[in-house]
From Swiss-Prot:
Disulfide bonds join C51-C66, C58-C75, C65-C88, C77-C86, C115-C130, C122-C139, C129-C157, C141-C155. Keywords: Amidation, Cytolysis, Disulfide bond, Knottin, Membrane, Neurotoxin, Repeat, Secreted, Signal, Target cell membrane, Target membrane, Toxin, Transmembrane. Cleavage of the propeptide depends on the processing quadruplet motif (XXXR, with at least one of X being E). It comes from Cheiracanthium punctorium. One of its GO terms (biological process) is killing of cells of another organism. This is DELTA-miturgitoxin-Cp1a. Spider venom toxin that exhibits cytolytic activity by forming an alpha-helix across the membrane. Lethal to insect larvae. Causes instant paralysis and death in the larvae of the flesh fly (S.carnaria) at doses of 20 ug/g, at doses of less than 10 ug/g causes reversible paralysis. Has cytolytic activity against insect Sf9 cells. Causes stable and irreversible depolarization of fly muscle fibers, leading to contracture at higher toxin concentrations. Destabilizes membranes. Residues 1-20 form the signal peptide. One of its GO terms (cellular component) is membrane. Belongs to the neurotoxin 19 (CSTX) family. Double-CSTX subfamily. GO terms for molecular function: toxin activity. A motif (Processing quadruplet motif) lies at residues 44-47. Its main location: secreted.
Length: 183
């Protein structure tokens, strides 16, 4: 019980830290990155250095592998007698996650700053669904056939099953933690 309680509190703390960042925080970070600081000088220096592509030799520069879509590739070394050969590779778990997530596109701006509410027709604006709870709703379309056999699309903004499961688990964890501490 202590183990699960510890990890649920830790998960909620990390989730709160991720979700609590506002636009003001982002503006402060942009200002800090543009200022003449030690960190920005280091980043400028590291940008000038070329990275080693995947499946290329990295024996002389083990920390110089390029990034994938999300994660940085790792320099994997193999000893053959007295010689050691190193190659930039992508870890198996990183490959699985990147293939599942795919490219991370920027969220499109809604038309007229109004989003499509939950269960409303989104056939003309598939990328403009509103945000509900933690996640943004997604436009889901179904093929409908009328009495004449003509096919039409029925589209609506809905919450995917995996998002519903995560939000439900967080609600239960909140309730358990609140009941445990008398809140």
């Amino acid at each position: 019980m202590k183990f699960s309680l510890f990890f649920s509190v830790f998960f909620l703390a990390v989730l709160h830290a991720c979700l609590s960042e506002s636009e003001i925080d982002l503006e402060d970070e942009e200002h800090f990155m543009s200022s003449d600081s030690f960190l920005s000088e280091i980043q400028d220096e590291s940008r000038g250095k070329t990275c080693i592509e995947r499946n290329k030799e990295c024996t002389n520069d083990r920390h110089g592998c390029c990034r994938g879509k999300i994660f940085k590739d790792k320099c994997t070394c193999v000893k053959n007698g007295k010689t050691e050969k190193c190659v930039c590779t992508q870890k198996k778990w990183a490959k699985i996650i990147e293939s599942y997530i795919g490219d991370i596109p920027a969220l499109p701006k809604p038309v007229d700053d109004k989003c499509v509410p939950k269960h409303a027709d989104c056939s003309k604006r598939k990328d403009d669904c509103c945000k509900g709870g933690i996640f943004k709703y997604q436009c889901k379309c179904y093929d409908m056939y009328d009495d004449d056999g003509e096919k039409t699309d029925l589209c609506g903004c809905v919450s995917p099953v995996e998002h519903q499961a995560i939000e439900g688990a967080l609600r239960i964890a909140k309730k358990l933690i609140g009941d445990r501490w008398g809140r």
